[in-house]
Amino acid sequence: MAGPMCLCGMMRLLTALFIPVLITSVGLCLIFVLLFICTRLWVQRKKKVEIGKDGKKKKVVAFFHPYCNAGGGGERVLWCALRSLQKRYKDAIYVIYTGDKDASEEQILNGAAARFNIKLSHPVRFIFLEKRGLVEASCYPRFTLLGQSLGSVVLGWEALTKCVPDIYIDSMGYAFTLPLFKYLGGCHVGCYVHYPTISMDMLSVVRSQHARFNNAAFISNNPVLSRLKLIYYYLFALFYGWVGSCSDVIMVNSTWTFSHILDLWKCSDRTSIVYPPCDVQTFLEIDINQHKENEEHSVVSIGQFRPEKDHPLQIRAFAALLEKKTAEQRAKLKLILIGGCRNDEDELRVSELKKLSSELGIPVEFKVNVPFEELKKHLSEATIGLHTMWNEHFGIGIVECMAAGTIILAHNSGGPKLDIVVPHEEQQTGFLADSVDSYAAAMDHILSLTPEQRLSIRQNARLSVGRFSDQEFEANFLASSEPLFK
C-alpha cells in the first residue's frame, strides 16, 4: 500500500504545483496580449490621414536612416531610392527618420545634391530623432551588437510614435526595428541590407580565435572567453534571423550579402539582389586617355572613416611601397584618403590615422566630407584606387574608382571579389590583395606597367561598371519594392 500512496502523494504535489504555474502563465500571456492590443490601438490612433486631390488617402512612405546627412554609399542608396519612388508614386508622402539634429532640412538636401549630384523632384519630410546616441557603438564597449540593436528598438519606437507610416523601409541596417513597425505600426515593411549585422564569417573568426577589429585580442587569446562570445553570437544570430524574417521585402546589395542573409533570415522568396547605385555616368565623362600618365602618381581611397574600412592597412601598405623606391621616386607618389565622418568617433579615428602616418614618416592627405566636384577631381588625377575592407558588402567607392579610370586595387573578399573586380569579357578589370605585402606588391606592379597596359585595364573596368548605374538601381529597386505598395 505504501507504494500507491506514495505515488498518489507525488501526483497531488505535482498537480498542486502545476496548476498555479499554469494559471500564472496563462494570466501573463493574456496580459501580454492585452498590452500588445492596447499599444497597437494607441499607435494606430496617432496615425494621420491626408487625402489627395483624387479623394484617395495618401500613402506615407518612411525611410529609417538615422545618419542621412553622412556622405557614404548607404546615403547614396537612400537618396536614389527616394528619387525613384517619387517618380513612380508621385502622390505619396515621403518621410525620413533621422538623428541629424545639427543640420536643417535644407542643409541635408543641399548636402545630398553636393555630394551625390542628386536632387529630389518632390518634397520630403524629416522626422528628427532625439535618441540617436543609443545606436552609437561608443555607448557599448562590451556587447556592442546587442546594445546597438536594443538601442535601435528604442530609437525606432521614438520614430513610430512621431509618425506612423503606411510603408516602412529600413535603409541603414537596423533590422530590430522591423517587427516594431510591422506588428505595432501595422505597416508594410521592407529593408535594404548593406551588410548583415552578424554573419557566418564573424562566427568563424571567433571560433578560430583570430583577432580583428570586432574580436579583441584578449578574447581571441582566451579559449573560455572565445567560447562565451561564440554562444553570445549564436543567440544573437537567432534573434537577428527572426527580426529580419519579419520583412515583407528584402533587398541586398551583393552576392556576398545575399548568401549570408539567406543563411540567417531564410526568406529566399522575398529576397533579391539590387546592386547599389553608383554615379558611373558622371565619372565616365572623365577622359582617361590624356591625364593618367603624368610622372606623379596618386593613390586614392574612398570610404567613410569607420574601423572596418581598415585605413591603417592602406597607410602601412603605402609605407611598404615607398620603402622599395628611391628618394626621387618617393617624391612622385602620394596617398590621398577621402571619406566621410559621421560623428566624433570617426573624427578621432582620422586623428589616429594622421598620427600613424606621422609615425611611419609618410605624407598622407586627408579629405573629409568633401563636395562631389572635389571628389571627382581627385579621382580624375589618380592612378590607383585603393580599398582594404575585409568582406566589404559591396563597395560603391570601388565602382566609382573604376568608372573614373583609376586602376582599382581592392580586398580579395566579399563583394569586390564576387561582384565587382571580376573579368569583363575575359579581360582584367583590376587587382585584389589581402595583406600589407600583397598590397604593396600590387601597387608596385601597377606602377611598373606600361601606359598602354594600364589604359587597357582602365577601359575594361569602365565597360564592366554599366550594371551598377543609377538607372539599373532605380529599375531594380522599383521592381523589388512594388509588393509594398499593393
Swiss-Prot record:
<comment type="similarity">
    <text>Belongs to the glycosyltransferase group 1 family. Glycosyltransferase 4 subfamily.</text>
</comment>
<protein>
    <recommendedName>
        <fullName>GDP-Man:Man(3)GlcNAc(2)-PP-Dol alpha-1,2-mannosyltransferase</fullName>
        <ecNumber>2.4.1.131</ecNumber>
    </recommendedName>
</protein>
<keyword id="KW-0472">Membrane</keyword>
<dbReference type="GO" id="GO:0006488">
    <property type="term" value="P:dolichol-linked oligosaccharide biosynthetic process"/>
</dbReference>
<keyword id="KW-0808">Transferase</keyword>
<dbReference type="GO" id="GO:0006487">
    <property type="term" value="P:protein N-linked glycosylation"/>
</dbReference>
<feature type="intramembrane region" description="Helical">
    <location>
        <begin position="230"/>
        <end position="250"/>
    </location>
</feature>
<dbReference type="InterPro" id="IPR001296">
    <property type="entry name" value="Glyco_trans_1"/>
</dbReference>
<keyword id="KW-0812">Transmembrane</keyword>
<dbReference type="Pfam" id="PF00534">
    <property type="entry name" value="Glycos_transf_1"/>
</dbReference>
<dbReference type="GO" id="GO:0005789">
    <property type="term" value="C:endoplasmic reticulum membrane"/>
</dbReference>
<comment type="function">
    <text>GDP-Man:Man(3)GlcNAc(2)-PP-Dol alpha-1,2-mannosyltransferase that operates in the biosynthetic pathway of dolichol-linked oligosaccharides, the glycan precursors employed in protein asparagine (N)-glycosylation. The assembly of dolichol-linked oligosaccharides begins on the cytosolic side of the endoplasmic reticulum membrane and finishes in its lumen. The sequential addition of sugars to dolichol pyrophosphate produces dolichol-linked oligosaccharides containing fourteen sugars, including two GlcNAcs, nine mannoses and three glucoses.</text>
</comment>
<feature type="topological domain" description="Cytoplasmic">
    <location>
        <begin position="415"/>
        <end position="486"/>
    </location>
</feature>
<keyword id="KW-1133">Transmembrane helix</keyword>
<feature type="transmembrane region" description="Helical">
    <location>
        <begin position="17"/>
        <end position="37"/>
    </location>
</feature>
<feature type="intramembrane region" description="Helical">
    <location>
        <begin position="394"/>
        <end position="414"/>
    </location>
</feature>
<feature type="topological domain" description="Cytoplasmic">
    <location>
        <begin position="251"/>
        <end position="393"/>
    </location>
</feature>
<dbReference type="GO" id="GO:0004377">
    <property type="term" value="F:GDP-Man:Man3GlcNAc2-PP-Dol alpha-1,2-mannosyltransferase activity"/>
</dbReference>
<keyword id="KW-0256">Endoplasmic reticulum</keyword>
<dbReference type="InterPro" id="IPR038013">
    <property type="entry name" value="ALG11"/>
</dbReference>
<feature type="topological domain" description="Lumenal">
    <location>
        <begin position="1"/>
        <end position="16"/>
    </location>
</feature>
<comment type="pathway">
    <text>Protein modification; protein glycosylation.</text>
</comment>
<dbReference type="InterPro" id="IPR031814">
    <property type="entry name" value="ALG11_N"/>
</dbReference>
<keyword id="KW-0328">Glycosyltransferase</keyword>
<feature type="topological domain" description="Cytoplasmic">
    <location>
        <begin position="38"/>
        <end position="229"/>
    </location>
</feature>
<dbReference type="Pfam" id="PF15924">
    <property type="entry name" value="ALG11_N"/>
</dbReference>
